[in-house]
């Protein structure tokens, strides 16, 4: 089997990349999805809040996915469901398997990786205590309730204040459960401010910052959860314990980009994002293999995933048509206050209008300036009244400014203000 482009993942990232590649003249495209339907995680996100940037209207997750799925059908783009990709070779040969076709070897001129991300589990955070039933990741509980029609519990405690945890606090409340509290290890929430307002404050659900779970009690089913305040080293403070009677503990303790295939292929990874190192075209360290969406870094909004994936799809089309320009790479370095940047490097020759750089900060900051520097010269200077790790930031660097860069790297950092 031979294709011009193979997209691995039929979620919002994969769909947007495939559609954009077709719009840019790529004929033979195949989308491979391991679930039984297209749309990815959106199919279980039945709440609203999607599409405000992309469609200028508020949609639910399935409605947002449906618009892209319909477009895929209209453009007659081929796809395979219930299909597991086993590996991708550096020569862009995809090994995949399903029950209908059996084992397949698919040759591609270009590949887009759009596998999304997965949740961290109890094992990844080493919570002490017994191992009864009733402990779920927030996303698993979301799928059970919204898609499978099962109620996971009646008295619930949520560890972690990521967006999925906040949304599930509201969802469980609406389904009749009593949400005792949301508990967060860090001194700040990992979720969007609007989700804290709409999911916790509106339903009087308490949020305990700088707290964590220190014990889990229960034989067959979860019976009690003990939380405690933590010090600046994130160690529990004796004497601050609070015990809750509950039958369910939901974990919203972070998302990890799903990069098992990327690592197997030998793609260069960034330990800060847990995703591939990409350039201005969302191309990885292996020419012709592109990556987009949550497989690169975890996004706040699906609208941003769609926009980034379109860039990857258009770039893959350029690669297939042999229109990529050669050039010297310039690196993007993280300065004070910046956890990571995406892309990590760029070639001016392939930036048509602007270079969009996405980043997260490492703490809560107020009244700062976000600066981009070429050596000692400040080339972009933005006022930022409020910055938080839970909200992704973006800097747009115009092509004209990029052309004037003299060094082989630019530095993005925070300057001045209050921490």
What is each of the regions a protein language model found here?
Residues 113, 135-145, 248-299:
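FAD-site-proximal beta/loop scaffold in flavoenzymes
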Residues 67, 72-89, 94-96, 173-260, ...:
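A Rossmann-like FAD-binding core segment of flavoenzymes
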Residues 1-4, 81, 317-419:
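Rossmann-like nucleotide/phosphate-binding core characteristic of flavoprotein oxidoreductases
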Residues 21, 111-114, 120, 127-129, ...:
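Conserved mixed alpha/beta catalytic, RNA-binding, or beta-rich assembly cores of soluble enzyme
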Residues 3-67, 71, 143, 152-198:
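Beta1-alpha1 glycine-rich phosphate/pyrophosphate-binding loop at the start
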Residues 103-104, 110-207, 212-221, 288-291, ...:
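Predominantly flavin-linked oxidoreductase catalytic cores and closely associated redox partners
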Residues 1-8, 66-155, 231-239, 250, ...:
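FAD-binding core/adjacent interface of flavoenzyme oxidoreductases
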Residues 292-336:
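A conserved FAD-binding loop/helix module that cradles the flavin
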């Amino acid at each position: 089997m031979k294709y011009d482009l193979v997209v691995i993942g039929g979620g919002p990232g994969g769909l947007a990349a495939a559609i954009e590649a077709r719009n840019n003249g790529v004929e033979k495209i195949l989308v491979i999805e391991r679930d039984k339907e297209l749309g990815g995680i959106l199919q279980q996100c039945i709440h609203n809040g999607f599409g405000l940037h992309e469609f200028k209207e508020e949609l639910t997750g399935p409605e947002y996915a449906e618009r892209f799925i319909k477009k895929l059908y209209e453009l007659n783009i081929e796809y395979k469901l219930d299909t597991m990709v086993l590996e991708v070779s550096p020569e862009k040969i995809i090994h995949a398997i399903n029950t209908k076709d059996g084992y397949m070897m698919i040759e591609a001129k270009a590949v887009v990786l759009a596998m999304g991300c997965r949740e961290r589990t109890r094992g990844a955070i080493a919570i002490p205590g017994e191992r009864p039933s009733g402990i779920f990741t927030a996303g698993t509980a979301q799928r059970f309730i919204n898609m499978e029609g099962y109620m996971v519990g009646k008295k619930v405690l949520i560890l972690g204040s990521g967006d999925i945890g906040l949304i599930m606090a509201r969802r469980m409340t609406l389904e009749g459960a009593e949400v005792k509290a949301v508990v967060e290890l860090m001194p700040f929430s990992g979720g969007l401010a609007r989700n804290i307002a709409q999911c916790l404050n509106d339903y009087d659900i308490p949020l305990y910052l700088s707290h964590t779970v220190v014990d889990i009690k229960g034989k067959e089913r979860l019976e009690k959860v003990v939380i405690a305040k933590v010090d600046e080293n994130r160690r529990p403070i004796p004497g601050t314990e609070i015990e809750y009677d509950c039958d369910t503990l939901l974990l919203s303790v972070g998302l990890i980009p799903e990069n098992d295939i990327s690592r197997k292929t030998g793609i260069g990874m960034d330990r800060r994002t847990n995703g591939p190192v990409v350039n201005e075209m969302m191309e990885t360290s292996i020419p012709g293999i592109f990556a987009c969406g949550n497989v690169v870094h975890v996004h706040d909004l699906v609208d941003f995933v769609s926009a980034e994936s379109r860039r990857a799809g258009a770039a893959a089309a350029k690669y297939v048509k042999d229109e990529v320009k050669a050039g010297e790479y310039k690196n993007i370095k993280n300065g004070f206050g910046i956890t990571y940047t995406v892309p990590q490097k760029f070639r001016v020759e392939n930036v048509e209008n602007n270079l969009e750089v996405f980043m997260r900060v490492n703490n809560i900051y107020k009244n700062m300036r976000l600066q981009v520097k070429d050596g000692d010269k400040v080339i972009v200077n933005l006022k930022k009244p409020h910055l938080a790790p839970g909200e992704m930031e973006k800097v747009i660097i115009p092509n004209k400014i990029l052309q004037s860069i003299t060094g082989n790297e630019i530095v993005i950092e925070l300057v001045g203000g209050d921490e």
